Amino acid sequence: MNCIPIVNENDAISTDELTKFGGNDILSALVAEFCNADVLINMSDVDGFYDSDPRSNPDAKMFDRVESITDEIYSIAGGAGTDRGTGGMIAKLNAAKIVTEAGIPMFILNGSDPEILYTLLDGGHIGTYFCADKSKRKADDAED
C-alpha cells in the first residue's frame, strides 16, 4: 500500500469501542494484521518496555528486544499506565502478541519526540523491538 495509517480511537468520547477493542493498542494491532503491515509502531509515553515502571523507578531497565511474549513478560508489565490512555503496558503487550503471532514485528517508542520516527527509519536503535514469529512470516516475505 505504501502508506502509514495512524490509528487512534478518540479516548475522550469513544468509550463503547474500548470494551470491544481494548483501546488504541489492540485496534492498531488488528488494523496492522488486517492490512498485512510490514511493522507496527506503537507510540507511548515511555521509551519502550521496561523491567519496572520507569516513572516510579529510576533504575528501571529497558528491554531492547523481546523475542516472544511469555507469561514472564506479562508479569513484568504490571498496571494500567497513565490517565492519558486506557490500556497501559498490558494492552501494548496484547497488541504485540497479536501482530508478532501474525508475522509482523512491533516497536514501542516514546511518542513525545516528533523526530523519533526519523531516527527509527534511519536505522537508529531506539525503543523496544518485538520480534515477529518467523514461522508466520507474511506470504510476500516468503517469496523473497
List each language-model region with its residue ranges.
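C-terminal catalytic "cap/lid" subdomain
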Residues: 1-144
